[in-house]
């Protein structure tokens, strides 16, 4: 078995975010890392929408990311620390839309090791040097400079190693143009290591160490080191030189401290806490991330606590000495992994979990009522300040980037009866969790919908003048009339436009600079800017059946297949070409391309005929109306559309930006198939046809504009958009009802919209999330969802949600009540009334936990609910709250053979589980009966067990439960579940159970799979085979009777199969005659499974399912990852295909090595050598390579570049999208 890996949705969780001017213009951009992906985002300063410019897989782990700019430069570069053992400097090239690797310096081994640098990066604020550090011992400094041609140069590394030292954080200190300086949080463990009593370990202090790079001596000196009172977790650089006092802020538990060289005394300020917080008051508070904003006249920091509260931090200075730190509560946003304050006044928040946000900073919070806390305020040691959290005041949310991270569980099923299956994804963490329903398609936002007096048959938009940015009219054609609407603040009917209203319209367009043309069955109407009208009438009894129009040309087809061609002359007059062309059959459809910039006309006309052919006809004056080429079609054409797509932006001599693309002829057939063919711009030849089935109706095509480029809207029983995005073609369905006719639409509110008709309504639509594979509907949940099952009859979901370090609703209410009573008791006689009012206000206050976070209850505190949800509407049908410290870990829905048709839900619950050091007071299996057509849970009984029941699976009318490391069969009893049989030989802890026939495949938490056979006659569970590798299995899926696919904690997927000669009729040998080694107890079972495939995904996979994703497609193995990625593994059906893709992968490894310097083969073999899997993500980078490299690779394969692209596209569309 050979598999091909494809990513459907890239990871969405963000681990690092940096901002700068990476394209060299004044625009602010953000570069984010998503594990093994680098992405460049650009927030639009006018609309606030975030656009993705570029996404690159780096096939390595990005451990750190920094932006820097050389002194006096205008462009920011990106430094990447990864697991490749190399430092890489990247530059963004806007003309090619790619990251270019400028430098790659090797300094150590690959992999995330503790003494190989790459974990921390720090840059001198003036861009003169960069320090790259490991977690332990090694630090290297590189000097950055320019050569004579103004190219960036990098020195050889200077060492600043210190053995036996752990590093917690590194930053560059702003010292102006003095010698560059770096500050590190370090801890020396040498004494602690050598002291057997443990005293030294208890007394070890963290130190703040400054390293200076002496540019004169080309040497790094350890300048200064001092011990810290509290344990710091990160550092913030304070602007220096002419901008500020320099130095660093140390964020530590409960305190923020300012430190600098020389006479500067330490200034420290406690971190304010929330008033009346339900958290444990003994728990420390830390800052988790920060952002700095600096202008010529001032600077401030925004720092976020682990509850999500942002504080604005300012420093008061007296000359060059800092005298106080001031903190002011700013706003509360979800806890972030990184924050960026952009110069355009935006705050980008990359959330740790869940969606990411872009906020506009509306106020700086200087002049409001909020109290300001200062280091100068007197406080007792151990006391702190208190503040009151509130909804957003200084920030305004302008955009939200959907993120599925973390996906904890996923099932694929067509519960909504839509033919195409939906993905039901349990994602998020704590109160920000959600169940999301993903459907393949682009999200459509409805701008306006209005009823029309009848059912129209077509719609167009036209501009009044070629220079206009927005459309002026919408023209709607009915069976016997034409309606003209003007576009302004509102859309209203106009009568003086010059259009003929008493006839249907076949087409209309802007002609020349400022004239309009209307083609109707009896003729052509040319309306000049001064409302003069020229008419051309059809000869005799003939009428116009089809037409094609662009800015300068009109072609019409009369009944009987006669073509008449008109072209506009320089005076703006429409002139008929002297000859007419008789076609051999009736014309069904026609298309002209837009006139290319700087040319007189479009050279080609495409005509589709009844005889199942498309013909390309020249419109060049030298051979006008001569046929150039022809393509036979599998069915009759319905519509044609010539577009220029896939262009790269180029600047001409005058600095005008234009794009040079390829001409594509799109052909929509009557059988619902879309063909895309390349049209040669010189000869008119047609080549390289791609085919996709779109739906059951004939396909109509319309040209629209998306992100400044031409795109094609194709309408069948579903509407599809074909567009080029990040140098790849996408053909994606719209998640919207069926449309009948459409046209591009541009107005002030909606610069790139679509106007469309559906039955008797006119709709204005916008597509904002181009490039998105899925559109999603999210239903909020209360705690982190762990698993869910689908009730087969009602299609409802039964979800278990469990959170550690959390209170149940009942405990929360009880704690609040208790705190309110304490408030009243603590008040003196005269303050009783006020205290009672405050207590009442506190009890009524309800800040949403999805924004303000849930209170942290402490270790060993658990909260759980069991929820029954309707997956289509998303409403909760039933909710069972478990008691405090009961944690639900497993759920199953099953029938028992002795109870007939009733369905039961079993939930495995742990009691008082402490994770480290692990201890548990036991567990329960709750049994519920599903009543009310699967909408309500009726409690039957609970069965006590000794350990955590972490896996439950229905099995032959009974149920299998993994209790710790015991595998048991239970049956339903009146008072509890009855134990029928057990096996004690599983190694550690059962994390999953799959069943097929009499076989049971058990996943162990760290010992891979164990095959068990149930013998009904002897009522025994007998182990007959296992795996030879230790795998920390997270999820598994059966592929057939002998084969199982599994994923582990470290990001690998494997497929394991039992050899054909495996015998599962083994006995436990009650006689004892068998030799000891035959039993195989020393090294597991006597029979071993074979590994068929191994592959390192690079993200922890938490669900696997064998399913089909598109109607009529083949089966594939779909996986989802903790980082929010969704991918598939698909089997090759022929040896030729496998051989071809193996060669593509081999050539790309050498021709197009990964961006951050990691070797592709060793990345995919991180833990086990990659076996029988070809990496489709690498193969698909073929399309983004430079044309000459594409040519070299395809020549090696004896193909042309379009043929290779077509193979890549075909394998993707056969299984997915």
Swiss-Prot record:
Residues 105-119, 145-168 are annotated as: Interaction with PHF5A, SF3B1 and SF3B5. The record marks 988, 1171 as: Interaction with SF3B1. It is found in: Nucleus. InterPro entries: Beta-prop_RSE1/DDB1/CPSF1_1st, Cleavage/polyA-sp_fac_asu_C, RSE1/DDB1/CFT1/CPSF1, WD40/YVTN_repeat-like_dom_sf, WD40_repeat_dom_sf. Component of the 17S U2 SnRNP complex of the spliceosome, a large ribonucleoprotein complex that removes introns from transcribed pre-mRNAs. The 17S U2 SnRNP complex (1) directly participates in early spliceosome assembly and (2) mediates recognition of the intron branch site during pre-mRNA splicing by promoting the selection of the pre-mRNA branch-site adenosine, the nucleophile for the first step of splicing. Belongs to the RSE1 family. This is Splicing factor 3B subunit 3. The lineage of its organism: Eukaryota, Metazoa, Chordata, Craniata, Vertebrata. The gene is Sf3b3.
